[in-house]
Each structure stands twice: as C-alpha cells, then as structure tokens.
Swiss-Prot record:
UniProt tissue specificity: Expressed in developing seeds, but not in leaves.
Enzyme class, first EC level, given as a word: oxidoreductase
Lineage of producing organism: Eukaryota, Viridiplantae, Streptophyta, Embryophyta, Tracheophyta
This enzyme's EC code(s): 1.14.19.33
Motif Histidine box-3, chain ranges: 325-329
Residue ranges of the motif Histidine box-1: 114-118
Motif Histidine box-2 mapped to chain: 150-154
Membrane-related topology note: Multi-pass membrane protein
Keyword Oxidoreductase: yes
A Pfam family recorded for this sequence: FA_desaturase
Domain notes: The histidine box domains may contain the active site and/or be involved in metal ion binding.
A GO MF term: oxidoreductase activity, acting on paired donors, with oxidation of a pair of donors resulting in the reduction of molecular oxygen to two molecules of water
Name the record gives this protein: Delta(12) acyl-lipid conjugase (11E,13E-forming)
Gene assigned in the entry: FADX
C-alpha cells in the first residue's frame, strides 16, 4: 500500500537540509528541524483559498451516503451470496475480502464522524453532533467523550507532558521487561496486539494516553479527561453505546452470534486496526521531536505531523485523512474534501516544515515500531544546534 516518496529533514535539528531520493528511507541521525517556524498560522491561512474553509452540508452528506451505500452493498453480497458459493475454498477467499473492504469503508465513516467532532461536517453544530453521535455509536466509539479528548490532543500535539494519545515514555519509565520485546517475533506480536486491541484499550483504560496519576477512561464521567460540565456528555455517549449493544444483542438472537461476528464483528476489528495504524503513523516517525513545557508552543507542536500515502484507492476510501493530516492539524474545522487543495497551497508557506513520507505503509509501520521506543533529550543538543534545547525530546530504541 502507498507510493514511494521522501521526507525533507535536517540532521540533528541544524545544518544543511538533506533531501532523500525516491524510495529511500531516513538515514541514522536525520531529523526534522525543531527551530521555531518563521511564519504564523494566519500567514498559512492567507495562503489557502478561502473556499477551502467553507463547509457544504450537501457535499458532506454525499460522502456519507456514498459510504452507507457501499457498506450496504458489501453486506448484501456477503449475506445473500457467500453461502451459495460452490466450493469451501471460495468461502475462505470471499470472507477476508469482505472483511477488509467493509472495515476500510467503515474507517472512512469513522473519519466523517471524527470531522463532525471538529465541526467540519456542516455549519450547524447540532447536525454535526447528531451525525457524529450516530456513526460513532454504531462502531462503539463514545462520540462526545472522544470529541473532548481529541480536542485536547489538538490543543497539545507533540507535548511530552500534555498530549492525549500516543504519548512516548522517557527511557526511565520504560518497563524493565521491554528490552526482551525488541526482537522481530516479539515486535510482530506487539504490532498485532496494538492493531487489534489498541483502540478499545485506549478508550477503556487510556493505554498509550496521557498519564493523569489515576484511573482514566473515556467511559468514566469522573475521569480527569473531563470537566464537571462535560460529564453529562459522557453519560450520553455511554447511552449510545448501550443502545448499540442492545441492538446487536437483538440481531444476534435473530441471526446468530456467528452471523453477527462474520458480518459486523470482524469488520469492526479491521476498522479498529485501521484507526490505530493511521493515527499512529500520523504522529510517529524516527525523525520527529517531542517538546516539554519549556519548548512547546501550539504551532510548533502541530507541525510535528506527517502526511502518508496509502495509494489512490485507499486515500479516497479513507477520505484523505491519511495524506492531508498536516493541514487538518492546522485547521481542524476544514472539511476533508478540501484538504488536498489546501495542502498544496499551505506547502508554499510551510516549506521544510511540511512533512510527507511515501514509504510503503507496512514498511513504515515496522520501522516506526522498531525505532520509536522511547524519547530522551540529546546530551549534546545545545552544542550541536547552537542553542540550549534540553526541552526537545527525540526517539531512541537502545535499552
């Protein structure tokens, strides 16, 4: 999946910029610049055509209805024809194709609900919340709870202290046993568990999330993620999941548990895996820094994101949440269908601060899980870059 490409980088945060050729990976020690950008968010916005910020209710619904049509078509074909296949081998071929296709389209719908949480679906907040709540509830995501924590992520991106998800640990806080999990077989196991269980574990137990010093969950109204006035929204989110659970229970009683697992359960696992893979690779790269409170600011932190190429078909299925993530972090209320045009315009201002990596996705995932184990500031960073940067943390993997 994905094309070939390169990411513009700086070595150790200073010195001449080295462009990698097509198909090449990042060499050891190569890093993006961590200097404060010489432009403002308003300058970036002025470079983008104004119509890119306009939300169209009709156009947004057209993407949603297209996804619903595909989900319905895949379901109809699987439920109506798969049991008629003449040879058992065809069953083993047909079901994985269905699971992947259905899970991929559901990921696109998940992305539309995510846009609703950013008020990027329409000009009407109520419409956005109703649409987002219905979609996310049907795929077991607590809409308002996630909307709140995700807003915090956008407000604190790349802060080693305050970011909400995929927060890297310093070396001193790595589990003692992790050094035994750096071999290839263990890494395969970790990737598998992360993709299949990572999303529900994050929502339920805040695994890989910001450390709050006590139990944290998207389902707990008293969780430190939420303010007292937001607790009612957590209850509403949970009610949506209870309603979905009851609906699935009734379906299982009518159709059978096996039927429900095949038609809904496995595609849901594929959806969860896609969400984890996409979001992890948007913010994780061996060349990326994290900042503590002495170095972090909003623009600097939100520029530590990378666009990736999943290929023209999957980029379209995922509504380009994959290859327009940089501009999404800068302008989260921009509708996804304007992201490509806005990215082209923004790159003229961003220059070397825009990051794109065309490494094939599975190769990139393997590299990131291997190289991005923990973060530490460089002992000689000040001497290398000409300024004290002890608040800048870089990925390492030697335990």
């Amino acid at each position: 999946m994905g094309g070939r490409g390169a990411i513009g980088v700086l070595r150790n945060g200073g010195g001449p910029k080295k462009k990698m050729g097509p198909g090449q990976g990042l060499g050891p020690g190569e890093r993006i610049t961590h200097a404060r950008p010489p432009f403002s968010i308003s300058q970036i916005k002025k470079a983008i055509p104004p119509h890119c910020f306009q939300r169209s209710l009709r156009r947004s619904f057209s993407y949603l209805l297209s996804d619903i049509a595909l989900v319905s078509a895949f379901y109809y074909v699987a439920d109506t024809y798969f049991h008629r296949l003449p040879h058992p081998l065809l069953h083993y071929l047909a079901w994985p194709v269905y699971w992947f296709c259905q899970g991929a389209v559901l990921t696109g719908m998940w992305g539309i609900a995510h846009d609703c949480g950013h008020h990027a679906f329409s000009d009407y907040q109520l419409v956005d919340d109703v649409v987002g709540f219905l979609i996310h509830s049907l795929v077991f995501v607590p809409y308002f709870s996630f909307k709140i924590s995700h807003r915090r992520h956008h407000s604190n991106t790349s802060s080693v202290d305050r970011d909400e998800v995929f927060v890297p640990k310093p070396k001193a806080k790595m589990p003692w046993y992790f050094k035994y999990l750096t071999n290839p077989p263990a890494r395969v196991f970790i990737i598998f568990i992360t993709l299949t269980l990572g999303w529900p574990m994050y929502l339920t137990f805040n695994i890989s999330g910001r450390y709050y010093g006590r139990f944290t969950s998207h389902f707990d109204p008293n969780s430190p993620i939420f303010s007292p006035k937001e607790r009612v929204l957590v209850h509403i989110s949970n009610a949506g999941l209870v309603a979905t659970g009851y609906l699935l229970y009734r379906i299982a009683m009518a159709k059978g548990v096996g039927w429900l697992i095949r038609l809904y359960g496995v595609p849901l696992i594929v959806l969860n895996a896609c969400v984890v893979l996409i979001t992890a690779l948007q913010h994780t790269h061996p060349s990326f820094p994290y900042y503590d409170s002495t170095e972090w600011d909003w623009l600097r932190g939100n520029l530590v994101t990378v666009d990736r190429d999943y290929g023209p078909i999957m980029n379209r299925v995922f509504h380009h949440i994959t290859d327009t993530h940089v501009v999404h972090h800068l302008f989260p209320s921009m509708p996804h269908y304007n992201g490509k045009e806005a990215t082209v315009a923004a790159k003229r201002i961003l220059g070397e601060y825009y990051q794109f990596d065309g490494t094939p996705i599975w190769k990139a995932a393997w590299r990131e899980f291997r190289e991005c184990v923990y973060v530490e500031p460089d002992e000689d960073d000040g001497a290398t870059s000409g300024s004290s940067s002890k608040g800048v943390f870089w990925y390492h993997n030697k335990l």
